[in-house]
UniProtKB/Swiss-Prot annotation:
Induction section of the entry: By auxin under dark condition.
One Gene Ontology biological process: regulation of DNA-templated transcription
Subunit-structure text: Homodimers and heterodimers.
Low complexity compositional bias, start-end: 488-510, 532-552, 742-756
Database matches in PROSITE patterns: B3, PB1
Source organism: Oryza sativa subsp. japonica
GO cellular component annotations of the record: nucleus
CDD domains, alphabetized: B3_DNA
Record's protein name: Auxin response factor 16
The keyword Cell membrane is assigned to this record: no
Domain notes: Interactions between auxin response factors (ARFs) and Aux/IAA proteins occur through their C-terminal dimerization domains III and IV.
Length: 1055
């Protein structure tokens, strides 16, 4: 028969003389998840749960439990009394509760129920060990873990040999047991020897049972046991009928509910599958939780060492456990599935108050703590959710901050993230949206999106050609057939300009019109080629002038390629082609025939954004300059063809495609602004071009200021440069700047591959150029042009040294190449030139997941230009530094370091997750660092120490030699001398947060390992430790750490 010993909570009548069972020891034996409600509080009693306890005690299936028709599924009761018991033979703990059903309740009872949730009756310091066969043998004694012995037992006197002492511990029945605690053996360990075998035999302990030692609030050593669950023989029906027990308890509850009279129940926490007497506050709180199918949740389970662990699961069903006998009951009405395969033995049905629902918000940009710790290789799957991955695969040119940071973007105004996700599923919505947006780029890119969605398995070069056509053709003009003479073409341009302004909106959305443009392209190429052949026959000029004109040829050759790919200004392109005809290999790589008829096809079309028309005199001067340069063509063209033929077809396509967006920006200028800009820049631009040419003659000095020469030295060049339009001069200067300094980059030349929002960057560049037109100052305009060069192809000096051009692989094979930023042409025609490092390059990049090639428009500005123009540096910096991997992986890899400016060609900056736009700026509004100076991230070298109610301190952890010095110093800092050094005091606990954001007890690790992994230290009170154990609070650690390391944060060593 069970012992009827009472507790100090509510002693039974007539038993006040008996020694009360220690509440902490009772709860320690009951388990870490057991918490009885306080007396006087309101509870909810579930008869189904009570029947399950009886069935578990009688080893009977739940299906055979009888029901009781007149008993409701739950009863709201008031807890009148609570008595703690322990069996005198087995030490099994159980509780006796007296409940009284209530129809209404007062405020005090409800308040008592709420306060009961915050009370933690588990002991602060204890350890539990499952006995092994050697522990239960008659010799050898009980082996105690070292850390447990140091925390729970009094300290040994190590001056003795061997160190030993006598321990006295009391059990649940207040019986004292004496043990000899000795430290011996090889290796040495803590043992309980004398008295242990007597305890084992008296309690009839077996291997698998557990023994626990605790220190109560009075620092008394207490001893308890937990018996392992073992199958027991079923009782004979003649001795006791389980059905009669079920009917008896259900009848008593039904009678009490009908008459509002008290009734008594017994609760066995070790035998009952779940608590069936729940605090009303806990029940009401659970009912407010909106559960649904598929919801994720956590649930606490007890571990072998008396700790707790959270298991993750998913709600798979909602319904009655027994719809026939207990209809509309909340008892185990949730059907769940568990994540871990080891959790297969967990029950499949739980109650709503037993789980902790997990809110899973939608992250379009995953937080830092969801990211992998190790960098990923290109093409490897990412940890992003599936929705985000699909979003990026469909629109790889959009940056991560699209529709989040720049919600007022002029490209896609009024489109929320939800609408974009809907467009991903329905491409027709994307086409409809593109018709309402006034942007020269949207229609072409909308078509490109549909192409990607519809043909994700196409060859990358085919998709490149498709996108190139969609981006170029909307900017071409449909007009009448171009006449053969050059001047007749010039005379038609004013009329074509007005015609273009009327037709352009329809051109951007008409595919048929694009086909007509392609035909017109070929027709114009035939007429322009005739003019080219006429100019090539006039090749007779002095050879001594070849050196001075060689640099101009190099400049205009690059200029020609830009105009060929973009089709920007027809008249300028014609004059340049007359002077410097492009090699046939250039357009051959674009997929055009080698025939001379196609060598000028792209430049012959009249364009809406043409700036100024040359006069007859200018045309004749251009022809004279062309005759002057024909001799140079013979010597240079063969070399240029050889260089370009060494490039593979995809590489040339990439180089030309990246110029398209740059040319489109200028086409947005109206004629009035164009004329104003040209008149202001005319004189200054000619001087700049002459200075650049003289620079080449005098050895390529690095200082532009040294190029200023006397008027007599500039005079011989006036006849050659005066014939050129100011647009050409400005573009020529920009073309000189594009070649850059071969020494400005030390990285080998490969392709940089990354999904970047090129569309928004292009529009920013367009707005910047419009602002530049409105500025009346010539010097300011020139500074704007110099601070914003055209997007170019960088020249890397090591491209010839490390990666031979003729051995390059196709673009799709360069995904694993080094981290250089662009392709490279041969620098031999431009050796000796040195230009400012502000001339950064543009990159042709690709999404590494589907190899979809895209052209990125990078505004390569200095930091001050970025700030003064109000550009979003959060996007711009991402663009400039994006690599062949996803730029968010780069952020992870470089979050604690700075970029190397010599390798990337951009100012150093420290990156934060999300491509932070924080830029160090001085009071004057300028960047605090030079353009190429390294900027290291601020690193904390001292360790933070925090204690609630006190100001935090910072210490140098490396100056301490051991834990004792650390504890003593911290105790002095916070005015708790003597309370941290004594390991047996329970007032304060010293814990630390390691580099994995786990909270551990200071002193468990070796000192050297502790110094290397500690991030911060916290001094917790006993109440804080208990609250952490109850709530599972890890002090601000991210949620996933709670789920992953719950076995560590709530084990037997909590305190």
């Amino acid at each position: 028969m069970k012992d009827q010993g009472s507790s100090g909570v509510s002693p039974a009548p007539g038993e006040g003389e008996k020694k009360a069972i220690n509440s902490e020891l009772w709860h320690a034996c009951a388990g870490p998840l057991v918490s009885l409600p306080p007396v006087g509080s309101l509870v909810v009693y579930f008869p189904q749960g009570h029947s399950e306890q009886v069935a578990a005690s009688m080893h009977k299936e739940l299906d055979n439990i009888p029901g009781y028709p007149s008993l409701p599924s739950k009863l709201i009761c008031k807890l009148l009394s609570l008595t703690l018991h322990a069996d005198s033979e087995t030490d099994e703990v159980y509780a006796q509760m007296t409940l009284q059903p209530v129809n209404k309740y007062d405020r005090d009872a409800m308040l008592a129920s709420e306060l009961g949730l915050k009370q933690n009756k588990q002991p602060a310091e204890f350890f539990c060990k499952t006995l092994t066969a050697s522990d239960t043998s008659t010799h050898g004694g009980f082996s105690v873990p070292r850390r447990a012995a140091e925390k729970i037992f009094p300290p040994l006197d190590f001056t003795m040999q061997p160190p030993a002492q006598e321990l006295i511990a009391k059990d649940l029945h207040d019986i004292s047991w004496k043990f000899r605690h000795i430290y011996r053996g090889q290796p040495k360990r803590h043992l309980l020897t004398t008295g242990w075998s007597v305890f084992v035999s008296t309690k009839r302990l077996l291997a698998g049972d557990s023994v626990l030692f605790i220190r109560d609030e009075k620092s008394q050593l207490l001893l308890g046991i937990r018996r392992a669950t073992r199958p027991q023989p079923a009782l004979s029906s003649s001795v006791l009928s389980s059905d009669s027990m079920h009917i008896g308890i259900l009848a008593a509850a039904a009678h009490a509910a009908a008459n509002s009279s008290p009734f008594t129940i017994f609760y066995n926490p070790r035998a009952s599958p779940s608590e069936f007497v729940i605090p009303l506050a806990k029940y009401n709180k659970a009912l407010y939780t909106q559960v649904s199918l598929g919801m994720r949740f956590r649930m606490l389970f007890e571990t072998e060492d008396s700790g707790v662990r959270r298991y993750m699961g998913t709600i798979t069903g909602i319904g009655d456990l027994d719809p026939v006998r207990w209809k509309n009951s909340h008892w185990r009405n949730l059907q769940v599935g568990w994540d871990e395969s080891t959790a297969s033995e967990r029950r499949t049905r739980v109650s709503i108050w037993e789980i902790e629902p997990v809110a899973t918000p939608f992250y379009i940009c995953p937080p830092p703590f969801f990211r992998p710790k190790l960098p990923k290789q290109p093409g490897m799957p990412d940890d992003e959710n599936e929705v985000e991955s699909a979003f990026k695969r469909a629109m790889p040119w959009l940056a991560d901050d699209f529709a989040l940071k720049d919600v007022q973007s002029a490209l896609f105004p009024g489109l929320s993230l939800v609408q974009w996700m809907a467009m991903q599923q329905n491409p027709q919505m994307l086409t409809a949206a593109s018709q309402t947006v006034q942007s020269p780029y949207l229609n072409s890119n909308a078509l490109a999106m549909q192409d990607v969605m519809g043909s994700s398995n196409e060859d990358p070069t085919k998709r490149l050609n498709t996108q190139a056509q969609n981006m170029v053709l909307p900017n071409l003009q449909v007009g009448s057939k171009v006449d053969h003479p050059v001047m007749s073409q010039h005379q038609q341009q004013p009329h074509q300009l007005s015609q273009q302004q009327q037709v352009q909106p329809s051109q951007q959305s008409s595919v048929v019109l694009q086909q007509h443009q392609a035909q017109l392209l070929q027709q114009n190429a035939i007429h322009l080629q005739q003019q080219q052949e006429h100019l090539q026959r006039q090749q007779s000029q002095p050879a001594q002038q070849l050196k001075a004109a060689s640099s101009l040829h190099s400049v205009e050759q690059h200029k020609l390629k830009e105009q060929t790919s973009g089709g920007q200004v027809a008249s300028q392109a014609q004059m340049l082609n007359q002077i410097f005809p492009p090699s046939s290999s250039q357009l051959q790589q674009l997929g055009l025939p080698k025939s001379p008829t196609h060598r000028q096809g792209l430049t012959g079309l009249p364009i809406a954004g043409s700036l100024q028309q040359p006069t007859l005199t200018q045309t004749s001067q251009v022809q004279q300059a062309a005759e002057y340069q024909q001799a140079l063509l013979q010597s240079q063209q063969q070399q240029q063809q050889l260089q370009l033929q060494q490039l593979s077809q995809p590489e040339v396509q990439l180089q030309l495609l990246q110029k398209i967006q740059q040319q489109n920006m200028l086409s947005q200028l109206n004629p009035q602004h164009q004329s104003q800009l040209i008149q202001q820049l005319s004189q200054k631009s000619q001087e700049i071009l002459q200075q650049q040419i003289l620079q080449h003659q005098f050895g390529g000095s690095d200082s532009i200021g040294q190029l200023k020469q006397s008027p007599s030295q500039q005079a011989p060049l006036n006849h050659m440069t005066g014939s050129l339009t100011p647009q050409q001069l400005v573009r020529s200067h920009s073309a000189l700047a594009e070649s850059g300094d071969p020494s400005s980059s030390t990285a080998p030349s490969t392709s940089r591959i990354s999904p970047i929002n090129s569309l928004s960057r292009a529009n920013q560049g367009s707005r910047n150029l419009t602002d530049m037109v409105a500025t009346p100052q010539i010097d300011n305009l020139l500074q704007e042009i110099q601070s914003k060069p055209d997007n170019r192809i960088k020249n890397d000096i090591q491209s010839k040294e490390t990666v031979p051009i003729h051995n390059r692989h196709p673009v799709s094979d360069q995904l694993d190449a080094s981290s250089a930023t662009s392709f490279c042409l041969d620098e031999s025609p431009r050796e000796g030139f040195s230009f400012p490092p502000v001339c950064l390059d543009n990159n042709v990049q690709v999404d590494p997941r589907d190899n979809f090639l895209i052209a990125e428009n990078v505004d390569a500005l200095m930091p001050d230009a970025l700030l003064s123009r109000g550009m979003a540096s959060g996007k711009g910096m991402c663009t400039l530094t994006s690599g062949q991997r996803d730029h968010r992986d780069v952020e992870n890899e470089l979050s604690s370091a700075a970029f190397s400016s010599q390798s990337f060609g951009v100012p150093d900056m420290s990156f934060k997750p999300g491509c932070s736009s924080d830029v160090a700026v001085t009071d004057a509004g300028m960047p605090s660092q030079g353009l190429w100076n390294n900027q290291t991230q601020r690193m904390r070298t001292f360790t933070k120490v925090q204690k609630r109610g006190s100001v935090g301190r910072s210490i140098d952890i490396t100056r301490y030699r051991d834990y004792d010095e650390l504890r003593h110093d911290l105790a002095c800092m916070f005015g708790i001398q003597g309370q941290l050094e004594d390991p047996y005091r329970m007032d304060w606990k010293l814990v630390y947060v390691d580099h994995e954001n786990d909270i551990l007890l200071v002193g468990d690790d070796p000192w050297e390992e502790f110094v290397g992994c500690v991030k911060s230290i916290k001094i917790l009170s006993a109440a804080e430790v208990q609250q952490m154990s109850l709530d599972g609070d890890l002090g601000g650690v991210p949620p996933q750490t709670q789920a992953c390391s719950a076995s560590d944060d709530a084990n037997a060593w909590r305190g």
